[in-house]
Amino acid sequence: MRFSVVFAAIAALSSVVTAERGCGAIPHKGFATELMEAMDNARASSFSNTTAANVTINTYFHVITDGNKGQINNDTLQKQIEVLNKDYSGTGFSFKLVGSERTNNAGWASGNDDFGMKSSLRKGGYDSLNVYFVPMLREGLLGFCHFPTKNPGKRQLIMDGCVINSNTVPGGSAQNYDEGRTTTHEVGHFMGLYHVFNDNGGGCQQDGDMVDDTPVQSKPSSGCPKGKDSCPQQGVDSIHNYMDYSYDSCLNEFSPGQIQRMQMLWKQFRAGNSNRSPKAMKPIIPSYVSDPVM
């Protein structure tokens, strides 16, 4: 996930072949520490995913267009929420599309004012999911999403949510990434999941995602490479896991450990901040944010 997330207006992913799933999600600086504390808290309380209640997440879709660029019809938005619910079935989470809106804004469509876009459009509290579909992310970048934090400030509340290349929705033009699973992948970051491969440059020497039941994996997958095994430790690479970079058609699972991780972090980070929203906090001075890291 160590990819630049600075938007550029110079390239649009319209009917192009994407070589690899480009993800720009980067955990905020304190996330690793907060994650370790959350894991300690969960162990102390004997938490397991079987004790967590089912959660319905209010979801808002924002379609950003520049004229005809980025248009997504209602049927496609419905298919996207159906993909999300199918992929998260069995996790304890479901998604209710409570609102969708379209905004024609050339600057937002080209990624020139991420903060301005979100501060104007974001809805709901910290337990709501906002997804912004934009047509012109930097070439090779299909999306990014913000990791949760225990005590979000107003800027973090505003910037929360996922930005998705509009060509990746079901039936879109991002070849091999046109079944809506970029949104599934990025929402995994919203829930607190790392990539299954090692983002820290540690090769096979580190467990990159800190989940016990995902085998150590040194690099992302591309395509659907059956039997790929990038590390000598037990287990082959998780090519079918939603948090890898495989083609959409190859992805079909979260591990039990990932499900428990999502349940744990939801309970400690998002459910506890359900009443917090940007509108309920003191105003801050807007500024251009080229990097969404908090």
Swiss-Prot record:
> Can you supply a Gene Ontology BP term from the record?
proteolysis
Any matching Pfam family: Peptidase_M43
Enumerate the subcellular locations listed in this protein's record, separating them with semicolons: Secreted
Q: SUPFAM superfamilies under this entry?
A: Metalloproteases ('zincins'), catalytic domain
Where, in this chain's numbering, is Zn(2+) bound?
185, 189
Cite the active-site annotation: 186
Q: Which residues form a coiled coil?
A: none
Residues bearing attached sugar chains per UniProt:
49, 54, 74
Q: Which family does it belong to?
A: Belongs to the peptidase M43B family.
Q: By what name is this protein known?
A: Extracellular metalloprotease ARB_07495
Gene source species: Arthroderma benhamiae (strain ATCC MYA-4681 / CBS 112371)
